Amino acid sequence: MQKLIMANWKMNGNSTSIKELCSGISQVQYDTSRVAIAVFPSSVYVKEVISQLPEKVGVGLQNITFYDDGAYTGEISARMLEDIGCDYLLIGHSERRSLFAESDEDVFKKLNKIIDTTITPVVCIGESLDDRQSGKLKQVLATQLSLILENLSVEQLAKVVIAYEPVWAIGTGVVASLEQIQETHQFIRSLLAKVDEKLAKNIKIVYGGSLKAENAKDILSLPNVDGGLIGGASLKAVEFNEIINQANKICTE
């Protein structure tokens, strides 16, 4: 399966640094049949990034509102996202859930706004350290996915990318063990299999959580890992490109 390597730049960068990043990423060589790339800049830089990257690199937004139009100061709608030429959308990132109190219902409502558009939704799920240590991992992940799996058709679900990001491994430098990643991705796939076996086999499940060049090969080689959602390591073109190179090699072998 093609690996999907995504860069979440979060609230980082300025016009100068983003121009340098785009220039660096534009230099990396990879087989587009084996690797797909997407970047998620801050919304104010989306048009700049689209204009500075090759067409083969997807560009996405980090968040939208679930309202269509109207008096919602500061918000961005799904229609606007499509209008400016975005390819991807992050939904339900752990920082949105924890810092802005986004609920599973909010995540579903946002997903529902774009599921029938040309935009690829990347739905983020993950557990806290307390959840894992108290044995609630499976319960938490199943709950986070329940509205989505119960209310979307198989055809709609097939458009979704799922990003598993253990909250305790995001921005901390702590990485889940290979065994933990593999077991969790397999569990997520088993939830999807209850809906449709073919869906479970073909849907992309990517890993996010302190993924960087030095551990990319091991993580991306796991059988149930279809790519990565990279945070801090994506802010340096050299390191992000090395992750892309590792993904390309894995898919070539």
From Swiss-Prot:
Binding residues for substrate: 8-10, 171, 210, 231-232
UniProt keyword annotations, A-Z: Cytoplasm, Gluconeogenesis, Glycolysis, Isomerase
Disulfide bonding pattern of the chain: none
Enzyme class, broadest EC rank: isomerase
Subcellular localization: Cytoplasm
UniProt-listed InterPro entries: Aldolase_TIM, TIM_sf, TrioseP_Isoase_bac/euk, Triosephosphate_isomerase, Triosephosphate_isomerase_AS
An MF annotation (GO) of this entry: triose-phosphate isomerase activity
Catalytic activity: D-glyceraldehyde 3-phosphate = dihydroxyacetone phosphate
Single Gene Ontology BP annotation: glycerol catabolic process
Active site per database record: 93 (electrophile), 165 (proton acceptor)
Pathway: Carbohydrate biosynthesis; gluconeogenesis; Carbohydrate degradation; glycolysis; D-glyceraldehyde 3-phosphate from glycerone phosphate: step 1/1
Gene Ontology CC terms: cytosol
SUPFAM superfamilies the UniProt entry points to: Triosephosphate isomerase (TIM) (SSF51351)
Record EC number: 5.3.1.1
Function: Involved in the gluconeogenesis. Catalyzes stereospecifically the conversion of dihydroxyacetone phosphate (DHAP) to D-glyceraldehyde-3-phosphate (G3P).
Family: Belongs to the triosephosphate isomerase family.
PANTHER family on file: TRIOSEPHOSPHATE ISOMERASE
SUBUNIT field: Homodimer.
Protein name (record): Triosephosphate isomerase
Organism listed in the record: Francisella tularensis subsp. mediasiatica (strain FSC147)
Classification of source organism: Bacteria, Pseudomonadati, Pseudomonadota, Gammaproteobacteria, Thiotrichales
